[in-house]
């Protein structure tokens, strides 16, 4: 199977809980290689741009407000079948439906403040990675 890349966000509520290291440890324990990461505080313009596909939906303004409420950690993860495996590790978008042992079951506070984001397809992963990382900012791991 081919190695894929996926995109991950640790959202403001999870950052505030001081669980970044725990989440990274779970990524690595699940076989992901972290090949790019940074912490930043999104501007309203960045959040609106990143979530543009949801503009006009009832939850959009609340999502933008939440995503700009504190720092986030964005990462690029690499593994076989990375997109699906990462989504499985995150759990259901609605934490009420997330299986025990998933990141959202452990760190989410609500549907909007669900602790984490993961790409839903390879195409989304490529677009989301390019939104936050420029050329040379993702480091392939050969060892």
UniProtKB/Swiss-Prot annotation:
Predominant location category: cytoplasm
Binding site for ATP: 11, 59, 87, 93, 104, 114
Catalytically driven reaction(s): a 2'-deoxyribonucleoside 5'-diphosphate + ATP = a 2'-deoxyribonucleoside 5'-triphosphate + ADP; a ribonucleoside 5'-diphosphate + ATP = a ribonucleoside 5'-triphosphate + ADP
Class in the EC hierarchy, top level: transferase
GO biological process annotation, one example: CTP biosynthetic process
Enzyme Commission number, as recorded: 2.7.4.6
Compartmental location: Cytoplasm
Keyword set includes Cell inner membrane: no
GO-annotated molecular function: ATP binding; metal ion binding; nucleoside diphosphate kinase activity
Pfam families attached to this UniProt entry: NDK (PF00334)
InterPro entries in the cross-refs: NDK-like_dom (IPR034907), NDK-like_dom_sf (IPR036850), Nucleoside_diP_kinase (IPR001564), Nucleoside_diP_kinase_AS (IPR023005)
One GO CC term, this protein: cytoplasm
Entry-linked Gene3D superfamilies: Nucleoside diphosphate kinase-like domain
Active-site residues (renumbered): 117
Keyword vocabulary terms for this entry: ATP-binding, Cytoplasm, Kinase, Magnesium, Metal-binding, Nucleotide metabolism, Nucleotide-binding, Phosphoprotein, Transferase
Cofactors: Mg(2+)
PROSITE patterns given in the database record: NDPK, NDPK_LIKE
Function, in words: Major role in the synthesis of nucleoside triphosphates other than ATP. The ATP gamma phosphate is transferred to the NDP beta phosphate via a ping-pong mechanism, using a phosphorylated active-site intermediate.
Family, similarity comment: Belongs to the NDK family.
UniProt subunit comment: Homotetramer.
HAMAP family: NDP_kinase
Protein name per the record: Nucleoside diphosphate kinase
Originating organism: Salmonella arizonae (strain ATCC BAA-731 / CDC346-86 / RSK2980)
């Amino acid at each position: 199977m081919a190695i894929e890349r996926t995109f991950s966000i640790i959202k403001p509520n999870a950052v505030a809980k001081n669980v970044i290291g725990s989440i990274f440890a779970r990524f690595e324990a699940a076989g992901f290689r972290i090949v790019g990461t940074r912490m930043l505080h999104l501007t309203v313009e960045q959040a609106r741009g990143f979530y543009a596909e949801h503009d006009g939906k009832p939850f959009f303004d609340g999502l933008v407000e939440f995503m700009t409420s504190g720092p986030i950690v964005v990462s690029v993860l690499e593994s076989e079948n990375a997109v699906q495996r990462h989504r499985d590790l995150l759990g259901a978008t609605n934490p009420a439906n997330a299986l025990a042992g998933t990141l959202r079951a452990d760190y989410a506070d609500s549907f909007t403040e669900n602790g984490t984001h993961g790409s839903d397809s390879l195409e989304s992963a490529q677009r989301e990675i390019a939104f936050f990382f420029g050329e040379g900012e993702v480091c392939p791991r050969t060892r």
